[in-house]
Amino acid sequence: MAGHSKWANIKHRKAAQDAQRGKIFTKLIRELVTAAKIGGGDAGSNPRLRAAVDKALASNMTRDTINRAIDRGVGGGDDTNMETRIYEGYGPGGTAVMVECLSDNANRTISQVRPSFTKCGGNLGTEGSVGYLFNKKGLIIIDAGADEDALTEAAIEAGADDIQPQDDGSFEIYTAWEELGDVRDGIEKAGFKIAEAEVSMIPTTSVDLDAETAPKLLRLIEMLEDCDDVQNVYHNGEISDEVAALL
């Protein structure tokens, strides 16, 4: 699958950079508040909230801060009127890009997102322009070192749709997005440690990028992730090991 395991190092590096600037905490708190408002404050029965809590803990957010954000979401109020907005567009090399935002002001958000596409040789599209190239799925990451046969058996037993070993030894497990929480619980009960679990947009096709185009896509991703309202960026660009070595 393009746009996921091959970009794990980029994702983690960006997370560290955002943390230094304080941006990641703002984004995480927004997600905690929104997830609690929509699905309730019990992470055990709210997969979106559970994923948000896990991300917050991984970023060294304190339990107290997390709980306060959840309480805000459950309590409602004017400061919780965030809506999920999805923007679709074309990036360098004809790549399909989907931008997931949490925002209380659509005009502000679009004024952040549109220039990012324009400056990187892409263009913002209309609703549905590239969405058909992605499937909404649950994605579970298991770090390297797990026994493949045992993990495969546990994943299938838990209800997973597919499991794919990665070049770095890790595993990506795909589920129906509605069943992410149940599959995660089943895999954990089988004794496997989950590195990450989230609802994601998985590309159905990929676009191979050359050494000239790849940096432009990476720049677009960075610019979008720098926008305060942007929570996630999904794309179908793929960079070969040969091209990556030239970057």
UniProtKB/Swiss-Prot annotation:
GO terms for biological process: regulation of DNA-templated transcription. Its main location: cytoplasm. It holds the Pfam family Transcrip_reg. InterPro entries: Integrase-like_N, TACO1_YebC-like_2nd/3rd_dom, TACO1_YebC_N, Transcrip_reg_TACO1-like, Transcrip_reg_TACO1-like_dom3, YebC-like. NCBIfam families: PRK00110.1, PRK12378.1, YebC/PmpR family DNA-binding transcriptional regulator. This is Probable transcriptional regulatory protein MS0710. One of its GO terms (cellular component) is cytosol. Keywords: Cytoplasm, DNA-binding, Transcription, Transcription regulation. It comes from Mannheimia succiniciproducens (strain KCTC 0769BP / MBEL55E). GO terms for molecular function: DNA binding. It is found in: Cytoplasm. Belongs to the TACO1 family.
